[in-house]
Amino acid sequence: MNKLQLLGVVFAKVNECSLELSCVRYCDPNLLLTKRKEFLHNAFVCKYLCDSLLSELQHFSCTNGLTACKHLAIILENLCEHFYVINKALCSFEIHKDHQQYYRTLFDVDQCSLHDPIKISFVNKQDLEITLTDFNEIERFLCKLNLIFPLIDARSGMRIISQIYDRLRKFTGISPLARLEFYKSACGGCYLCYEELQMTPNNGSSVQKRLNGVLCEHVTYTKDLVFQENEYLEVLREDLKRDNLLREDMRTELDDMKKILSNKKERGFYVPEAEQLLHRYDVFTDDIPNYIYTLSDLTYWSKTSEKIIKTMNMTMQQLNVYNNNMIKLKRSISRALNDIEVRDCFDVFEKVVDKRHCMFLGSMFTSSAKIISLLATQCLTAFEEKAVFERLNECDALCSTVNTILERLKSASGDGKEGITKQDFQADELIKGYNVSDEVSVRKKTYLNKVADKGYSKIVASLSTEERSIKKLIDINFLGTLCIDMMVKLEKMFYKRSQIGQMVENGVHLLALCNYDNHLYIRNNLSRQSISTENVNGVIQHILSFLCGPIFTHRHDIFPMPPNIDMAYACDNANVLPHRKEELMQCVNDITSVHGWSISSYNTFFKIDSVDLNTAHAHVWGYVKEFIVAVTLYNELYGQRLRAFRVDENTIRECGLYLTYNSDIPLVLKTDKNVIYGSDIYSILYAHMHHA
C-alpha cells in the first residue's frame, strides 16, 4: 500500500469518526457519560493521529498542493478540539446537571470568534483588513488574491493563508454538513459557476447579470436524500419487535402515524375508462374522430392536475401531528432502553422555535422533500382561498367533462361518430338562451375559469422555477472542497516563493559578476531591436501566462486554452473594473517600442514604490512585460535558447531564468555551473552570455 492509499484509508476512518462525533453533540449527556471510556479512547486515538500526521500533512500540502492532505489536517485539528470541548462540558455537566449550559458550551452559543479580520500587507507599504463571514466570501477573497499575488510578499502571503486556514477550519467544524450561517443560498456563483456559464452563449448579457441569482453547487452542494417515512416506521417496528420492546402503546403510536401519512386529501379523480378508449388509437390509425382529440386533451390536463395533487399531499397540521407523535415515540423508546427520560438537544430547546418556523428549519423525522411539498401545497391553498376562486375547481371540471364525453359515447350508436363533434363537449349547457342576464353569467364564468386556469399555471410554473432555490434553502447542504482547493494552490505558490532564499543560499550574487557597464551593454543592444511581427502574439500570450495566478490554469490542460482566457477569468472573478482590463491590455500590447517595455533602471527590477494599489499593480504588469520581452529579444539577437520560467510552476532544476515575484530576489538564473541571483534583468542576461 503506497502513501496515497494509506492516506485514503486514514481519511475514511477519520471522516467516520467525525460524522459520529458531530451526532454525539446532540445526544443527552447522561447517555454519553455511560460510554465515557469509549469516548476517551477515541479522543486519545485522534490526539495521537493529530500529533503524528498534522505537521507532515501541512508540509506535503505546501509542497505538492494536494487538497486531501489539507482537508484531512482540518478535520483532525477540529476533531481534537471538539473532543476536548465535549469532555470539558461533560465534566461540568456531572457537577451542575444543567442541560442548557452543556449544549450552549458545545455549540459556542455565548461567544463568537469566527469573524476576526484578516490582515493583508502589500509590498507597496499598504495594509488592509478584511472580515470574512462565510465560505462564499472566502472564495471571492481568494479570487482577488489570485489576481494581485505579485503585490504580496511571500512571507506575508503565508501569514494570510494561515489566517484563511484558521477561518476555514472554524467554519468547517466536524460535520460534513454546512452550517446555515456559513454559506449563501443565492450568492451569485463561484469561479466554477462562472466557468460553466462561459460554455454557453451569453445572448448579449453581461457576466454579472448572468451570475446574479445563480445557485452555487460547488462551495456547498445538495444531495437528493430519500427518506420514506412509512418504510422507516416498518423498520422501526421490526427492530422493536426483535428486541422485545414493542409494547402496546408503541404499537398504537406507530399505527397512528401510518394513518396520518396515508391520510391524503384527494381533490378529484381520474377516469380510467377514458384511458381504455384512447388505448385503441395509435399513430397508424386513420381518420381519428375529433372527439378523441378532445378526450385526449382533457385526459392530459386531468392527469396533470392529479399528478400535482399526489405530489403535494401533506398539510401543516399533518406535519405537526406526525412530529409530535414521533417525539412521544422517541421518549417511550428511550425510557424502555435506558430506564430514564432522555433529553437531547432538540428536547431541551423544543420551545425556542415556533411551529411555523419549523417548516423552514425542517425536522429530524421528516424528509426535506416533504417540507418542500408542504410549501407548494401552502402556495396553492393560499391561491384557492381567494373569494373569486372559491367555487372553481379545475380538476372537478375536467373530470366532469371527461365523464360527459364517455356517457355520450356510450349512448351513441355504432362507434360514436354519429352527430358527435368537438363542440358537443364544450359548456353548451351554460348557454340556453340569449337574454342579457344569461349572457352576462356565461361570460363571467368563462372569464373566471380563464383566470383560474392562468392562476394555476402561473403558480405551478413559479414553483417549478423556484424548485432549485427552495431545495437549496431547505435541503441538506454538504461542504464542498472548493475553498480548500483554492487555498492550497495559493499556499503552494507562496511557499515556493518563500523558499527562494534557501535555494540560492550557495549561489552567486549578480553584483559579484556584473557591473553597471554590463547592464548598459545589454540594454543598449536590446533597445535597438524589435520583436518580429510573427512573434508578437506569442509574446503577448507569454506575458499574460506570467500575470495569471495559480487558480486558473487552463493553459496547462490536456486541451489547453490560450493564457488570455485564464487572465480574463481571473479578472472577471476578482471583479476588475472594465477600464482596468483595458489598461492591462494596453500595457501588454505595447511591446514594439523600447519606451513601451523597458522601464527598470540598474538593479531596481521588481522594486515597487509606496503608491496606491492600482498603480503598484500596473508596475507589476510592466516588470513582467520587460522580463518576457528582454529574454525574447536576447534570444533573437544573440542566438541563445534561454528559457523563462515562473518559480511557482517549475522547480529550479532546469537551466533557465526564473521570475520569483519577490522584491528582494526577483531573478534567479540556473546554469550548468551555478545559480546566479539578483535584481537586474540586463545584468543577469549578460551573466548568462559570459558565465553560463
From Swiss-Prot:
InterPro entries: UL28/UL56
ZnF (C3H1-type) residues: 190-218
GO cellular component, one term: host cell nucleus
Keyword terms: ATP-binding, Host nucleus, Late protein, Metal-binding, Nucleotide-binding, Viral genome packaging, Viral release from host cell, Zinc, Zinc-finger
This protein's record includes keyword Zinc: yes
Any one GO BP annotation for this protein: viral DNA genome packaging
Recorded GO MF terms: ATP binding; zinc ion binding
Residue sites binding ATP per the record: 634-641
Superkingdom of origin organism: Viruses
Principal location class: host cell
Pfam short name (any one): PRTP
Localization of this protein: Host nucleus
Family: Belongs to the herpesviridae TRM1 protein family.
HAMAP family: HSV_TRM1
Described function: Component of the molecular motor that translocates viral genomic DNA in empty capsid during DNA packaging. Forms a tripartite terminase complex together with TRM2 and TRM3 in the host cytoplasm. Once the complex reaches the host nucleus, it interacts with the capsid portal vertex. This portal forms a ring in which genomic DNA is translocated into the capsid. TRM1 carries an endonuclease activity that plays an important role for the cleavage of concatemeric viral DNA into unit length genomes.
Protein name, per record: Tripartite terminase subunit 1
Gene it is expressed from: TRM1
